[in-house]
Amino acid sequence: MAEKRKYEPLKIEKKWQEIWDKNEEFEPKDDLSLPKKYILSMFPYPSGRIHMGHVRNYSIGDALARSYRKSGYNVLHPIGFDSFGMPAENAAIKHKIHPKIWTYENIDYMKKELASLGFSFSKKRILATSDPLYTKWEQSFFIKMFEKGLVYRKNAIVNWCEYDQTVLANEQVEDGKCWRCGNDVVQKELPGYYFNITKYASELLDDLKLLEGKWPNQVITMQENWIGRSYGLEFKFSLDEASKETLGGKFDGFEVFTTRPDTIYGVSYTALAPEHPIVKALLESDKFDENKKAKIKAILNQSPRERQASDKDGEFLGIYVVHPLTNEKIPVWVANFILADYGSGAIMAVPAHDQRDFEFASKFNLPIKPVVKPLEGESEGSKAYSEYGVAINSELINGLSSEDAKSFIIEKFEKDGLGKRITNYKLRDWGISRQRYWGAPIPVVHCKCCGVVPEKEENLPIALPEDVEITGEGNPLDKHPTWKFTKCPKCGKDAIRETDTMDTFVESSWYFARFASDEKTWEQKALDEKSVNYWMNVDQYIGGIEHAILHLLYARFFQKVLRDLGYLRDDEPFENLLTQGMVLKDGKKMSKSKGNVVDPDDIINRYGADTARLFILFAAPPQKELEWNDSAVEGAFRFLNRLWEKSQTIKKIDKLPEIDHESLNKDEKFARLKIYEALKKSTEVFGDTFAFNTLIAACMEALNAINAQDNDDVNAEGFFIILNLLEPIVPHIANELSEELFGRKNFTKIAVKEEVFVKDSIALAVTVNGKKRAEFEVTASENESEILKQAKQNVAKWLEGKEILKEIYIKGKLVNFVIKG
């Protein structure tokens, strides 16, 4: 008897990883007539080590990619590295190492880690966004967007992180803090470059309908709220004559936007953001005493988070506007709750019908005039009534519903030339300027003669100088002795190169299209039209929900821009989106600071990659949080050992055996039932639910059922199918056992055999005088007299000594005995 082989995961995993690499089994085929699937997991930042969140993300994507390959699809499953960014500079300061060296050493290490898990990535299309070629084409996109008016430069109040010494986009500020370092964000006026994402606001919002049922509702809702479309009236409050004089004739009024023009008669004050030009002019004048100036400057210096957390506060500015309908004088205040970048940074305040306005008016004893009556009952005086109702105390619209009153006021203002109906968005243009070294240089120069001039395409890429000192103070590019000095591409005179680099979210906004472009064309063009339009859009995208209004919104914007520039065809980049849950330990997100990190390398070295993958996909549905459990990891390892041991009892075959199902005994039939139930389950899991935990459970049940009988053909058939189903999940052991037993001929699409689901017997209920007393199994071949005989035996104690008045048999359902007494 041959000696049993021991399951040695590290040995077989290394073997199969080498075979896959040698045979280039995971490279997409050049035949673009084949049906395709593009499976993409969000690429990692090269921090130096992969973590369990990465393992989960890439295990999900890999299972799908492998499944589609078996089903005959041409599959693109790429990986790369989002390799620009501030952590590299922070590491340079801490470890005295150049950001480029730190980044690429980390990439090399992470490539090995990812390979050790057996992920079926295309190795020919691996990219890093800090590669010069990637920078070249990104800079080319920037220039084309600049020429189309989709990029512009302006001075603006920006979100500034003192710790990272850089500008942040609105989306990168979370509760007033920097999304990356967690420190407070302050407001600062700086020149910078902006992507005109608001030009696409309507399309970005409307096209979310295309994603319904394909993206999580939560992500769609978050983007809807972030884009924030609202309809209303924009009009101008004119300053009274005395106020114009106070401001030296520089201003005659200011624009406001309101979504509730039906409440215009309830305006008791107006309020400006602290950054408003009128406030700035007054601060620079001699009209304010020092105490008032100090208070306003204190508000200006507060971070958005501090302003939001503070009580409503402000100052009367000593000026008035004229109400456009009543000609009343309305006081103008500066208020800490007004956002400079929403609308015009000014509001009409209606304290009776807006809670923020109410709180401010209550604090400063300003009038509160109700102009909307609730449809039922009365409004409370202790808070604002913000719902719709009927107009009151409003001369021209009394008695009208809020909807009709809105329409009336808008029409009147438009007719009289006082204002206009507009659509407004909360979404702001994307500020991309960053005062950091390790990013893609913005490809423009500043010329005294020509102004801001984009670089010539033939000069790209504008590469970073490598002889820099990273100290954390200021911008290394600005301080470099030679790099920024250049010639103007337009006139040839001396010019200064732009020293800001692009926000790293720019890189991740188009990488999916670069992956879809044939790598043989990467030198010659940004995107190869033929291959990109074959592969795009991404069939399944996988990543964390934390990217809902950052990366996912920017990527949708870039897709539309590249479509309009003629590079892409589709309106949306990602057909389907799966947002996987976090991996927790002890109920908390894994982090070094909490001391609860599990190193994937440790798990692989102890149990093998297949055990890590099996546990990750079995422990919870992908959309749910996953709690790390050491004993469950042990359980996954034991299952693979049982699979290995069972394989040594299986006969070798190269196709499914022909089995006469009717000739099998009960246990053999049950085993086949469980085998094909698992096969059916796989269609549902890989095609729809991604509930890999249910498929793994079905395979475990099937293995148990196989072990409970000893038919060689059923064993072989079952193992043939189980290895097929498990291959996307635990590919190393599945390939090893399949090669040994089936020559890997079972890794193809297998048809379900419906005969195994035909029931040989049915359960009949037995009732006595309509009350259920028993249940028993009968075969389809048994006749009525045999069934009645068995039924009597099953309820004998209830029939004993009784007269049976009637015997009723309802075929396939029940037997009822009607007895006397």
Curated annotation (Swiss-Prot):
Catalytic activity annotation: tRNA(Leu) + L-leucine + ATP = L-leucyl-tRNA(Leu) + AMP + diphosphate
GO biological process, one term: leucyl-tRNA aminoacylation
Pfam families recorded: Anticodon_1, tRNA-synt_1_2, tRNA-synt_1g
PROSITE patterns named among the record's database cross-references: AA_TRNA_LIGASE_I (PS00178)
GO cellular component: cytosol
MF (Gene Ontology): aminoacyl-tRNA deacylase activity; ATP binding; leucine-tRNA ligase activity
Sequence motif 'HIGH' region, location on chain: 44-54
Predominant cellular place of this UniProt entry's protein: cytoplasm
EC number: 6.1.1.4
UniProt KW keywords: Aminoacyl-tRNA synthetase, ATP-binding, Cytoplasm, Ligase, Nucleotide-binding, Protein biosynthesis
Motif ('KMSKS' region): 589-593
Protein name: Leucine--tRNA ligase
Species per Swiss-Prot/TrEMBL record: Campylobacter concisus (strain 13826)
Taxonomic placement: Bacteria, Pseudomonadati, Campylobacterota, Epsilonproteobacteria, Campylobacterales
Gene: leuS
